[in-house]
Regions:
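Membrane-embedded alpha-helical segments of integral membrane proteins
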Residues: 1-21
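Membrane-water interface of alpha-helical transmembrane segments
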Residues: 3-6, 27-33
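N-terminal secretory targeting and juxtamembrane "stalk" segments of secreted and cell-surface proteins
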Residues: 20-24, 33-34
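Hydrophobic alpha-helical membrane-insertion segments
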Residues: 25-27, 43, 58
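Internal/C-terminal transmembrane anchor helices
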Residues: 29-52
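Hydrophobic alpha-helical transmembrane segments in integral membrane proteins
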Residues: 46-64
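Non-catalytic, solvent-exposed segments at the cell envelope interface
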Residues: 59-70, 75-78, 84-442
């Protein structure tokens, strides 16, 4: 809409130029007016291009349909003589009859086309039963969601699974999920955003585990943001689990809406929007901003990336990613990692509202496009940006991490083997609810 107004303005000024030239018979006053008008046209053309760039960037991350990719693979044992999909004609191939069944069937159809007929298949109830069958060579190959390789390695006795297999075929199965326009139902004065960081590089649309799970509770009137961090191993239920508890990080394997459902259930709160990015997008955004200044309350090193000192640290994208991912350097492990992740989010918010970024908007937009996904409408984004430009007051940002007790349990995603989980601390969860409601009701 702003672009249309500017284009109309350009047309009007062009008409004024011709009228002015005719009326003045090319005398100096007319020429001077024409020069001024041409200068105005140049400025407005730049404005059109800038706004179009904003429009294109915003549209790229706020599509009406969200693309979700599932990277499906065919794997065999490392020492197998099978090297290609065409070698599978005489072999028994395993697959799991689970949430990925539609994607598995598409891969099986590709196998059938490759071997020139119907191959031999055996269905399993879960990934671990299928892996056991591959190990004892009941089956010779398996159709698998690649994201589940890391899940399998979390199981006791399966830690070296990836080193025992080789992938002979891979294909991305693409689904399009309709994004509901929430611009009319949400209140931009107060809202909750789910920030999801998935554990992959490359294409942000690939479904994977969500290792960063932060709720940002925002009050745009009082300029207050409350960050609530939930550890990746929190033992929770989610919409897909039918009441069976699972790791919070595994909820992301079934889509971002599933992660949102888990947190809404845990904290009794409605999540209005989500922002989802992976490692690559995280690095791109921070580098586009010229880096961020992050406060560290610990002195530690992440080899070979950087040594972090107590106090302010200016970090590039890869340095910020290493800071946010590290947990082995701390006695508190994942809890400290969550605290550091919120420090990074705080630094990003502060940088995004700085004059340095506003003056460098073009480069920022180049870095943002395609780096993340969100269901926030372009109208809501424009409204928030406009309000921040009018009132450039800094936000007060508070953070809180819920904790729990570590234990070994079976989960919805890992029903046949035990894995480390964190049983939620009820008092912490209740305090987080109070903090959330404190912002929404203040």
């Amino acid at each position: 809409l702003p672009s249309k107004f500017l284009i109309v303005g350009i047309v009007v000024i062009v008409v004024v130029i011709f009228i002015d030239l005719i009326a003045a018979r090319k005398l100096w006053p007319g020429i001077l007016t024409s020069i001024i008008s041409i200068a105005l046209i140049a400025v407005m053309i730049v404005g059109v291009l800038a706004i179009n760039k904003v429009d294109n960037t915003v549209d790229k991350v706020t599509d009406k349909e969200r693309e979700e990719k599932t990277e499906m693979v065919i794997a065999v044992l490392k020492d197998s003589q099978t090297e290609d999909i065409s070698d599978l004609s005489e072999l028994l191939i395993g697959y799991v009859n689970d949430d990925d069944i539609d994607s598995s069937k598409k891969i099986m159809s590709e196998i059938d086309n490759s071997v020139g007929g119907s191959a031999n298949y055996n269905a399993f109830d879960d990934n671990f039963a299928m892996v056991d069958a591959l190990y004892n060579q009941t089956i010779k190959a398996m159709v698998l969601n690649k994201a589940n390789i890391s899940v399998i390695e979390e199981g006791e006795g399966y830690e070296d699974f990836e080193s025992k297999i080789k992938i002979i075929y891979s294909n991305d199965i693409v689904n399009y999920i309709k994004v509901v326009d929430k611009s009319q139902e949400n209140n931009l004065d107060k809202f909750v955003v789910y920030i999801s960081g998935i554990d992959t590089f490359g294409d942000v649309s690939v479904r994977s585990r969500s290792d960063v799970n932060i709720l940002a509770v925002v009050d745009t009137k009082t300029k207050h943001i409350q960050l609530i961090n939930t550890p990746r191993d929190y033992y929770v239920t989610h919409p897909k689990s039918n009441g069976v508890k699972d790791k919070l990080t595994h909820a992301g394997l079934y889509g971002v809406d599933n992660s949102i459902g888990a947190l809404e259930s845990l904290y009794d709160v409605k999540v209005n929007y989500y922002v989802r990015m992976n490692f690559s997008g995280f690095e791109q955004i921070i580098d586009a901003m010229g880096g961020i200044d992050v406060y560290s309350d610990k002195d530690f090193t992440v080899e070979p990336v950087k040594h972090y000192t107590v106090g302010e640290n200016h970090l590039s994208g890869i340095e910020a990613l290493a800071f946010a991912r590290e947990r082995h350097a701390f006695a508190a492990g994942d809890i400290q990692r969550g605290e550091n992740q919120m420090k990074v989010v705080t630094a990003m918010i502060n940088k995004l509202s700085s004059k340095e970024v506003l003056y460098n908007y073009s480069k920022i937009l180049d870095g943002v496009a395609g780096a993340f996904q969100t269901d926030m409408s372009s109208e809501d984004i424009y409204s928030l940006v406009k309000n921040q430009l009018v009132d450039n007051t800094s936000y007060t940002i508070d953070s809180y991490t819920v904790t729990g007790e570590g234990k070994s349990c079976t989960t919805y995603s890992m029903p046949r083997t035990r894995a480390y989980v964190m049983e939620p601390n009820v008092n912490d969860v209740n305090h987080a609810k109070e903090l959330i409601n404190g912002v929404l009701n203040e």
